[in-house]
Curated annotation (Swiss-Prot):
UniProt keyword DNA-binding present: no
Gene Ontology biological-process annotations: translation
Family listed: Belongs to the universal ribosomal protein uS12 family.
Cross-referenced CDD domains: Ribosomal_S12
Domain of life: Bacteria
Protein name: Small ribosomal subunit protein uS12
PANTHER family: 30S RIBOSOMAL PROTEIN S12 FAMILY MEMBER
NCBIfam families reported in the protein's UniProt record: rpsL_bact
Gene3D superfamilies, alphabetized: Nucleic acid-binding proteins
Disulfide bonds: none
GO molecular function, one term: rRNA binding
Species of provenance: Photorhabdus laumondii subsp. laumondii (strain DSM 15139 / CIP 105565 / TT01)
UniProt keyword annotation of Ribonucleoprotein present: yes
Subunit annotation: Part of the 30S ribosomal subunit. Contacts proteins S8 and S17. May interact with IF1 in the 30S initiation complex.
Length: 124
């Protein structure tokens, strides 16, 4: 145990928290260009074809981003916005594509939970 005098001379150091989304560099979202759009299969015990794209960000990082929702219009050279948030059953995918922003369209015919998929309120 350190004495009071030792703690006055050299206080205890704080643990440095490691970020789960280093490519965002403490920003809420980042813009990037799709370099590859593809599907991949999840870890066991799940089974699907998950839509993913490889993105070159404005700060030079290249990351994988998940494309949520049913159907998308992304292809190579599409400009998209990414946010943090990993996909638990896809190793290495730590970012989500923001639907309805820049070149990424909202989900077609979405009626519920629209704000998460970039869909405007339908005309009554």
């Amino acid at each position: 145990m350190a004495t009071i005098n030792q703690l006055v001379r050299k206080p205890r150091s704080m643990k440095v928290a490691k970020s789960n989304v280093p490519a965002l560099e403490a920003c809420p979202q980042k813009r990037g260009v799709c370099t590859r759009v593809y599907t991949t299969t999840p870890k066991k015990p799940n089974s699907a074809l998950r839509k993913v794209c490889r993105v070159r960000l404005t700060n030079g990082y290249e990351v994988s981003s998940y494309i949520g929702g049913e159907g998308h219009n992304l292809q190579e050279h599409s400009v998209i916005l990414i946010r943090g948030g990993r996909v638990k059953d896809l190793p290495g995918v730590r970012y989500h594509t923001v639907r309805g922003a820049l070149d990424c369209s909202g989900v077609k015919d979405r009626k519920q939970g629209r704000s998460k998929y970039g869909v405007k309120k339908p005309k009554a």
